[in-house]
Amino acid sequence: GDKYRXIXGRXNNVDXEKTXAQLPPXFPIKIPPNDXRI
């Protein structure tokens, strides 16, 4: 939860996860944009 809260700047890590998936640069750090697996 701290990753999403820190990256997305949201108190609610669930909301941060949803927002980060759509609004850069706040994106889920556990899924790098250069990840060859995705």
From Swiss-Prot:
It comes from the Eukaryota. Its EC number is 1.11.1.7. Keywords: Heme, Hydrogen peroxide, Iron, Metal-binding, Oxidoreductase, Peroxidase. It is found in: Cytoplasmic granule. Its cofactor is Ca(2+); heme b. It catalyses: 2 a phenolic donor + H2O2 = 2 a phenolic radical donor + 2 H2O. Its main location: cytoplasm. Binds 1 Ca(2+) ion per heterodimer. The keyword Oxidoreductase applies. The keyword Oxidoreductase applies. GO terms for biological process: hydrogen peroxide catabolic process. GO terms for molecular function: lactoperoxidase activity; metal ion binding. It is an enzyme of class 1 (oxidoreductase). Belongs to the peroxidase family. XPO subfamily. Mediates tyrosine nitration of secondary granule proteins in mature resting eosinophils. Tetramer of two light chains and two heavy chains. This is Eosinophil peroxidase. The gene is EPX.
